């Protein structure tokens, strides 16, 4: 996989939190979030997202959130890596692997890291239903620690389609 080639001196900013969403129709949860956060004008299709950032000279870390437990549609890690490869002047790919995937998730992480396709692991404890100190996540931490790659994770509540933040998963939010 082609590594990023970002000329940071040419950038005006760098966004470290850019979701690449699935390319199908919005789910009810997504519609409610767009309305709540007033983000309806933000580009959702990937070519437009790339152009949005490039035209403003903003670099970005792109990722998805693997939600295998919720069933919510999401982009795949390979799609995120491909996006970053196609837009290597502005994008750096992080993968997202649910720690509950176990050995299969660890093997996927090793493959993505070895290929050079990703430069970090984005976890989301409230959505993926684990505590940051849960041993279920240790094997993934080890893959990325060995590669000297970061593992950022938010610890805030999760937006739900009910028009509020979820209370059921706030226990994972620190």
Where would I find each of the regions flagged by the language model?
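An N-terminally biased module of ancient metal coordination in phosphate/nucleic-acid-related enzymes
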Residues: 1-72, 78
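Short, flexible, glycine/charge-rich loop motifs used to bind or transfer phosphoryl groups or to couple energy/partner
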Residues: 2-4, 50-51, 83-84, 111, ...
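A residue-identity detector for tryptophan
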Residues: 8, 46, 156-159, 163, ...
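Histidine/acidic-residue-rich catalytic or RNA/ligand-binding cores of hydrolases
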Residues: 24-30, 162-172
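Active-site gating/metal-coordination segments in enzymes
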Residues: 59, 67-167
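Non-catalytic alpha-helical scaffold/packing segments enriched in small hydrophobic residues
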Residues: 139, 171-174
């Amino acid at each position: 996989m082609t590594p990023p080639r970002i000329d940071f001196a040419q950038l005006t900013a760098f966004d470290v939190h850019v979701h690449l969403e699935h390319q199908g129709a919005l789910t009810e949860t997504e519609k409610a979030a767009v309305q709540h956060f007033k983000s309806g004008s933000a580009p959702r299709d990937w070519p437009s997202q790339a152009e949005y950032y490039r035209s403003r000279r903003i670099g970005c870390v792109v990722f998805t959130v693997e939600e295998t437990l919720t069933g919510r549609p999401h982009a795949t890690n390979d799609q995120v890596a491909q996006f970053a490869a196609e837009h290597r002047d502005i994008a750096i790919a992080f993968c997202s692997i649910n720690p509950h995937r176990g050995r299969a998730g660890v093997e996927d992480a090793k493959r993505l890291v070895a290929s050079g396709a990703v430069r970090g692991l984005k976890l989301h404890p409230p959505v993926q239903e684990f505590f940051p100190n849960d041993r279920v996540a240790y094997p993934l931490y080890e893959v990325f620690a060995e590669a000297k790659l970061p593992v950022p994770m938010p610890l805030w509540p999760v937006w739900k389609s009910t028009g509020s933040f979820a209370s059921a998963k706030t226990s994972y939010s620190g």
